[in-house]
């Protein structure tokens, strides 16, 4: 098989938002858990280790619940010889009932699976007293029927975790769900730095509107305060540099699977300078195509 081979026979294509029900199965060590996390990233409600006997009940519940549950993924593994027959029958029943499940089967070469199990010092769930290779062979036999039902076949032999995640997100994720989201948070240093901040910048080098009587009681969300802050020497360079920094790093964050970035801007109390800068920075990031919002942690605390 070629590197990262993904086979998607037939129509319709499972990409986009048309798919409402996904069944994930495949060999142990093949990457089911990574597939599950990737589906969660793009908005699926994921049920892991679901007994195949409950698949129809879960599908009916998801359809009745509506909302986020309409995009449901069920992750199944093999634990008994009855698994393969039961799973094939359950998938056929789902199709006959009109649920239209898309079946994802993850696989990898035997030598790759052996290396993966040895690297984490785990035994194969079906090897018993035998060797790893014995457990893999037993599982392949049990999964043969399920593999034949697959709509999407993913060979993970030459994929790392991030590559597999991106492949699944490309197949099943709406564009909005795959986008990196940036939250620009204003804060006051006297209340502490936001613990979840990925970036922190200090706006206290700018003159403080607190010392301007007509601005003191207003916040950085008010145009008069914002104009005062952004009109100060160095303010434009500060915002532009921070925006350039964030734009330069977002592509790398997306490749690594990061979905949320928090960029913090602080001033003394989190009322004037940091608020104005955060609003302006979020607006500029949106102009470059990023999904950016501004939040003001410490407004109202003074």
Swiss-Prot record:
Belongs to the RapZ-like family. NCBIfam families: PRK05416.1. Keywords: ATP-binding, GTP-binding, Nucleotide-binding. SUPFAM superfamilies: P-loop containing nucleoside triphosphate hydrolases. This is Nucleotide-binding protein Strop_3101. It comes from Salinispora tropica (strain ATCC BAA-916 / DSM 44818 / JCM 13857 / NBRC 105044 / CNB-440). GTP binds at residues 77-80. Pfam families: PapZ_C (PF22740), RapZ-like_N (PF03668). Displays ATPase and GTPase activities. GO terms for molecular function: ATP binding; GTP binding. PANTHER family: RNASE ADAPTER PROTEIN RAPZ. ATP binds at residues 26-33.
């Amino acid at each position: 098989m070629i590197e990262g081979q993904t086979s998607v026979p037939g129509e319709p294509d499972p990409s986009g938002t048309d798919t409402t029900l996904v069944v994930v199965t495949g060999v142990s060590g093949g990457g089911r858990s990574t597939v599950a996390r990737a589906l969660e990233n793009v908005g699926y409600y994921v049920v892991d280790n679901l007994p195949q006997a409950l698949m129809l009940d879960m599908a009916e519940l998801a359809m009745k619940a509506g909302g986020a549950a309409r995009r449901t993924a069920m992750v199944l593994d093999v634990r008994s010889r009855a698994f393969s027959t039961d799973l094939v029958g359950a998938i056929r029943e789902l199709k006959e009932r009109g649920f239209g499940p898309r079946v994802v089967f993850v696989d990898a070469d035997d030598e790759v699976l052996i290396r993966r199990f040895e690297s984490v010092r785990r035994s194969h769930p079906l090897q018993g007293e035998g060797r790893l290779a014995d457990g893999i062979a037993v599982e392949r036999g049990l999964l043969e029927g399920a593999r034949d039902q697959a709509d999407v076949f993913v060979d993970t032999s030459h994929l790392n975790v991030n590559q597999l995640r991106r492949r699944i997100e490309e197949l099943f994720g709406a564009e909005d769900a795959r986008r990196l989201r940036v939250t620009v948070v204003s804060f006051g240093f006297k209340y502490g730095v936001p613990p979840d901040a990925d970036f922190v910048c200090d706006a206290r080098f700018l003159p403080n509107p607190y010392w301007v009587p007509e601005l003191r009681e207003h916040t950085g969300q008010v145009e008069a305060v914002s104009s005062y802050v952004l009109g100060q020497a160095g303010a434009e360079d500060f915002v532009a540099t921070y925006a350039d920094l964030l734009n330069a790093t977002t592509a790398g964050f997306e490749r690594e699977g990061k979905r949320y970035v928090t960029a913090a801007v602080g001033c003394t109390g989190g009322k004037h300078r940091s608020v104005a800068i955060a609003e302006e920075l979020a607006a500029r990031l949106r102009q470059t195509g990023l999904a950016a919002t501004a939040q003001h942690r410490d407004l109202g605390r003074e």
